[in-house]
Amino acid sequence: MNDGRFHHWKAHFMIHILNKKEIRSHTSLRGWAALMVVFVHFRSFFHSSIDPDEFTFFLYKGYLWVDFFFILSGFVMAYVYDIEHPKRHSMRDTMHYLIARIARIYPLHLISLVATLLFFIMVAFINWGLGEEACCVFDDSLRNAESLVANLLLIHAWGMFDWVTWNFPSWSLSAELFCYLIFAALLTIDGDNRKLALVALSCTAVLFYCLCIATSSDVDENFRLSAIRAASAFTIGILLFLGRSAISTLSERSLTCIQIAACIALFLSLHFGVADILSIGLMALIVLVTWEDRGYLCTCLDTRYIHAIGLFSFSIYMWHYLIKFIAKQDWESFTGLPVQSSAVGSMLFVAGMIGLVIPIAVWSYRHLEIPTRKWINLRLTGLLEAKYPPNWQLIMVPSERKR
């Protein structure tokens, strides 16, 4: 595609982007969920005298906030790409969707994976320079050549490993990609067949949660089922969108009461460590009752800084674990003391870690996440348009903040 034709196409592309109003409450809720995951992983730094797991299950059950991400994702994808429209999408439009999704998650995943690999290479060289065994690059079953290739292909949570590998949080991106491919398949089939596919997905979700209940296991207990776990929560999000009219007639006061009751119930269910399916159901209810950006909870969520945390949530999520690992290694190398050596010291360390994660995430969002997303979107879409020149048709790709 020559430059003139490319810029002509780009102008049309921007004009015909499907405009969807951002669900600001959902953006803010993503930020809350990301911070909860950070606290879940940082709680291991606390001194035993202030171990939160001694008096509450709230952080122990924090893995459920990842399921919350999947529910939000399913709802937003159904909303942005108009899943209830019976007409099937063309393969070309579906490819545009996949390009947008890959551009959304893969660049930061690749950058953080490379950073993780470089860190372990650096540690190996330092150990070698000190006359110690050069370890830590391909050190165990969590970090080997096979898992590295799987991470590069973003398929490492598709049932081939027993646990997380390399940059641990990236497992959810792999599971998310699995959901994106399922959603792409839904877009390419028409209304009746799409309904049948959704019924099949719903049955799969029911079977997964019934298996968890029957075996008295947590949803994260069998890592090889991570893709099914993600698809189950993602399907809940789609179904919530299809049933969203259930709250449209509620007054703002009624909606506020439901929002407050759902939040209190969710807090209590996490605190007492009840069955995961109940907490997931309450999370789903919160997603549903906030999608219209009405009610007191939405007013609280729609503040500048809380919304900003939502925008930075992906970078927060992707960098916090590597920062945690590096900081722990450096602290213990320089001081010779474990992080948990004192209650006050451990609290200050956790506060410092959170204070470090946020600015790094802001920088990452502005200088890595957004630029690479735009670059890949333009380049891959340009290649697609060069191969399949359009007689203009609507391309359903959300604007930057809605993705």
Q: What is the predicted function of each stretch?
A:
Residues 30, 67, 176, 309, ...:
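Short, conserved phosphate/pyrophosphate- and ester-handling motifs at nucleotide-, phospho-/glycolipid
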